[in-house]
């Protein structure tokens, strides 16, 4: 009898507690942002499909710019408006400063030493300071100009060799390898691989696989039930394998440096030396795994050039653009863009052609329009006929001739500050003259995490909810952009939009404390590499494929890229 009373008491207690918690959940749920009805266990995962960025944008049209989803059992708030993004990432920056850490990133304790995943604490500030002072500071980047020139020259030489042999260039592999070795020389003072060999392809695939596995757990790995501990999808197993390979490579380089520290001239200190020196000063040995994890965080960076350059070269071919030596402003002949070569210098970097430096044209306005106008979204671009080309040329002739001349100094070199502040952007690499709003090939979604329950635009957001800011949806918001999918560069001519996290219509690098530290490197490397490729060659698709028949399927992940490699045949100018 006593057992029966105990069981009844326990049941009554459970029923009471469960009822109170249910009432609390209902009260909270009424104050949550609107969203679709979740299914048991999986929540709203079934609504995401193969292209979550597109699915979320469509759902936002139904449920509004701030939307509540359940990914598995995790409450997820999706932001698809620049106004709400400003509230989250600027006005409440500290609250939203922590990343949502995917479960698989904890393998090999990587999340404990990576400035990408660490919460905002003293360790994160130290690592961020090292990155900013040793890699991404203006003085450091300007001092490495010779290294960028060397790596771009190697890229041009490789394309020249392919042109001579009539071979196609895998643009993604070539630009990845070039930037990989630029980064590895900055960190380790040596090349990691031959940028045009199969080893570069393997390294690229290794880095990409790490990014993909980390991204999968944001959606498919969120099912909160016991089987998750057994890794039924094999994500943890694969990630452990990838990290073991990557950390083994980096750890080997660290051990090699430790052995040669006493013999090596440290006049030109690199990033690894900076880490080791900090370790020595603090009397704490920076173990191999910690150093490796810090450095592994940097290696998604080489994907940025090929994500940007591949689509632009495709669109260059698609619109039959051509760079030629002409006098005057430049013109459009037979649907082709033709430019002259008045000197242009992007900061310390000069564009390269063949085996010598080559300055670019005074009608950089035309090149700028191609660069910024064609670089972005492949799927919805609507600029394909000669009438549109003629219209753009007419607008350029009226609008940009005066603008360009204002920024050319007496030496006929365009100054970096004026050039970049008035023309270039990166991520959706365009700052002012974006023909299509951001997000085409930049990070389509990024994740932050609430530290406490708080209010946002009248809604209650529970503590530890996941927050997704949909850059892709913001960039295609018809309330924000008139005809957002139409090629219309003139929409930005009078715009003051900036990419440094102040204007939330364009945040390809994020905003607030967690804004990407690689922006200074990006705005130096991408224009020079891309400009040199265009300044040296004409390009056509491999295999006689018509541009309209090219497979333009997207590869969804932390960044958006072409699923199939872009193969193009260069022809020297």
Curated annotation (Swiss-Prot):
Main location, first listed in the record: endoplasmic reticulum
Keyword Iron in record: yes
Signal peptide: none
Subcellular location: Endoplasmic reticulum membrane
Example of a GO biological process term: regulation of root development
Cofactor: heme
GO cellular component: endoplasmic reticulum membrane
InterPro entries assigned to the protein according to its UniProt record, in alphabetical order: Cyt_P450, Cyt_P450_CS, Cyt_P450_E_grp-I, Cyt_P450_sf
Class of the enzyme per the UniProt entry, highest EC level: oxidoreductase
Enzyme Commission designation: 1.14.14.-
Residues where heme binds: 516
Expressed in which tissues: Mostly expressed in flowers and leaves and, at low levels, in roots and stems.
Catalytic activity: an omega-methyl-medium-chain fatty acid + reduced [NADPH--hemoprotein reductase] + O2 = an omega-hydroxy-medium-chain fatty acid + oxidized [NADPH--hemoprotein reductase] + H2O + H(+); decanoate + reduced [NADPH--hemoprotein reductase] + O2 = 10-hydroxydecanoate + oxidized [NADPH--hemoprotein reductase] + H2O + H(+); dodecanoate + reduced [NADPH--hemoprotein reductase] + O2 = 12-hydroxydodecanoate + oxidized [NADPH--hemoprotein reductase] + H2O + H(+)
Gene Ontology molecular functions: fatty acid omega-hydroxylase activity; heme binding; iron ion binding; long-chain fatty acid omega-1 hydroxylase activity
Membrane protein topology class: Multi-pass membrane protein
Transmembrane segments: 3-23, 298-318
Domain of life: Eukaryota
Keywords assigned by UniProt, alphabetized: Endoplasmic reticulum, Heme, Iron, Lipid metabolism, Membrane, Metal-binding, Monooxygenase, Oxidoreductase, Transmembrane, Transmembrane helix
Coiled-coil residues: none
Pfam families: p450
Role according to the record: Cytochrome P450 hydroxylase catalyzing the conversion of decanoate (capric acid) and dodecanoate (lauric acid) to their corresponding omega-hydroxy metabolites, 10-hydroxydecanoate and 12-hydroxydodecanoate, respectively; these hydroxylated components affect plant growth, including reducing root elongation.
Similarity comment text for this entry: Belongs to the cytochrome P450 family.
Full protein name: Lauric acid 10-hydroxylase
């Amino acid at each position: 009898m006593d057992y029966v009373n105990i069981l009844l008491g326990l049941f009554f207690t459970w029923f009471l507690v469960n009822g109170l918690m249910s009432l609390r959940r209902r009260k909270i749920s009424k104050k949550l942002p609107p969203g679709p009805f979740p299914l048991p266990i999986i929540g709203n995962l079934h609504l995401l499909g193969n292209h979550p960025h597109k699915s979320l944008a469509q759902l936002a049209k139904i449920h509004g710019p701030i939307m509540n989803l359940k990914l598995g059992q995790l409450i997820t708030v999706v932001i698809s408006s620049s106004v709400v993004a400003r509230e989250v990432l600027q006005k409440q920056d500290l609250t939203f400063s922590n990343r949502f850490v995917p479960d698989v990133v904890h393998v090999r304790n990587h999340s404990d030493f990576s400035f990408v995943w660490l919460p905002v604490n003293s360790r994160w500030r130290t690592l961020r300071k090292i990155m900013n002072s040793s890699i991404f500071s203006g003085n450091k980047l300007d001092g490495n100009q010779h290294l960028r020139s060397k790596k771009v020259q190697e890229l041009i030489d490789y394309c020249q060799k392919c042109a001579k042999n009539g071979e196609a260039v895998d643009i993604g592999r070539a630009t990845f390898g070039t930037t990989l070795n630029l980064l590895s020389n900055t960190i380790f003072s040596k090349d990691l691989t031959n940028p045009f060999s199969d080893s570069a392809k393997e390294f690229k695939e290794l880095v990409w696989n790490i990014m993909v596995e980390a991204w999968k757990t944001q959606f498919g790995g969120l099912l909160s039930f016991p089987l998750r501990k057994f890794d039924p999808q094999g994500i943890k197993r694969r990630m452990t394998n990838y990290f073991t390979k990557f950390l083994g490579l980096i750890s080997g380089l660290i051990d090699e440096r430790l052995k040669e520290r006493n013999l090596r001239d440290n006049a030109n200190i690199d990033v690894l030396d900076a880490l080791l020196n900090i370790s020595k000063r603090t009397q704490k040995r920076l173990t191999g795994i910690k150093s490796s994890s810090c450095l592994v965080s940097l290696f998604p960076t080489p994907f940025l050039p090929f994500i940007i350059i591949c689509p632009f070269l495709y669109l260059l071919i698609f619109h039959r653009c051509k760079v030629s030596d002409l006098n005057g402003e430049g013109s459009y002949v037979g649907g082709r863009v033709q430019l002259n070569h008045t000197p242009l210098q992007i900061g310390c970097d000069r564009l390269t052609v063949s085996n010598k430096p080559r300055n670019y044209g005074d009608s950089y306005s035309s090149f700028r329009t191609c660069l910024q106008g064609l670089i972005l979204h492949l799927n919805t671009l609507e600029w394909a006929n000669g009438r549109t080309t003629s219209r753009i040329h007419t607008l350029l002739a009226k609008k940009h001739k005066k603008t360009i001349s204002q920024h050319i100094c007496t030496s006929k070199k365009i100054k970096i500050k004026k050039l970049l502040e008035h023309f270039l952007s990166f991520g959706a690499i365009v700052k002012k003259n974006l023909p299509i709003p951001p997000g085409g090939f930049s990070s389509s979604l990024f994740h932050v995490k609430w530290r406490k329950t708080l209010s946002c635009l009248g809604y209650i957001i529970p503590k530890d909810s996941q927050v997704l800011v949909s850059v892709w949806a913001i960039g295609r918001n018809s309330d924000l952009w008139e005809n957002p999918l139409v090629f219309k560069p003139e929409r930005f001519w009078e715009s003051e939009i900036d990419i440094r996290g102040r204007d939330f219509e364009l945040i390809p690098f994020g905003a607030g404390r967690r804004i990407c530290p690689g922006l200074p490197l990006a705005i130096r490397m991408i224009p020079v590499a891309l400009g040199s490729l265009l300044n040296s060659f004409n390009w056509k698709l491999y295999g006689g494929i018509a541009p309209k028949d090219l497979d333009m399927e997207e590869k969804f992940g932390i960044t958006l890229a072409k699923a199939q490699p872009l193969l193009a045949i260069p022809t020297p100018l």
